[in-house]
A protein has these predicted regions:
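Acidic-leaning, charged glycine-interspersed low-complexity segments
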Residues: 22-27, 46-49, 96-145
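Oligomerization/assembly interface segments of phage tail-like spikes and tubes
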Residues: 66-83, 131-143
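Short, surface-exposed loop and linker segments with low hydrophobicity and enrichment for Pro/Ser/Thr
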Residues: 44, 61-70, 125-130
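Extracellular/virion structural assembly segments
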Residues: 64-70, 78-104
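Charge-dense, low-complexity intrinsically disordered segments
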Residues: 3-7, 86, 90, 127
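Generic low-polarity alpha-helical segments
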Residues: 13, 17, 51-53, 71-75, ...
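Small/polar-rich, solvent-exposed N-terminal microdomains that initiate assembly or binding
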Residues: 1-65, 108
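Secondary-structure boundary/capping motif
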Residues: 30, 36-39, 68-72, 95-98, ...
Length: 145
């Protein structure tokens, strides 16, 4: 059984993703996407692509006494839009494809992750204030102990 003080599914998911999502810039060049959890994303000097992991809804205790939990995380993909405001769909789709294989039905530490079957993703949207296009992948988690 897990204690409330150990309830950090975002850290566990970050561990699964860190260093494993690559962005192909050209045939010769690629880079690794940076991963941020809530409260860690800087306000300046963000890369052209990055991923943010945020809590998405409530955490539910599945047992009495408490010890087994379930919840959701939003995994938000950010990609700097082209100069005309259109999305770099190939890059976003590449990131999404990698996330699907890294996250769906995977465990890290005391947590199990799967893509939420009832609310998989949100469509690509553009934020003119930031210049980024985003897509959100909804991930369910539960504790394994």
């Amino acid at each position: 059984m897990i204690k409330l003080s150990e309830l950090h599914p975002d850290k566990a998911l970050e561990t699964l993703l860190e260093g494993n999502v690559s962005i192909e810039i050209s045939e010769e060049e690629s880079r690794v996407a940076l991963i941020y959890r809530q409260g860690e994303r800087p306000n300046t000097d963000l890369g052209d692509e990055f991923i943010e992991i945020l809590p998405n809804g409530v955490v539910r205790a599945m047992t009495k006494p408490m010890g087994v939990y379930r919840g959701n995380l939003a995994v938000i993909l950010y990609c700097k839009a082209q100069s005309d405001g259109t999305a770099k769909e190939n890059r976003i789709n590449s990131m999404l494809s990698q996330l699907e294989s890294l996250v769906n039905c995977k465990s890290s530490g005391k947590f199990f992750f799967e893509i939420n079957p009832s609310n998989v993703i949100t469509p690509i949207s553009y934020n003119s204030a930031t210049g980024y296009t985003t897509m959100t992948l909804n991930v369910e988690w539960h504790t394994t102990e």
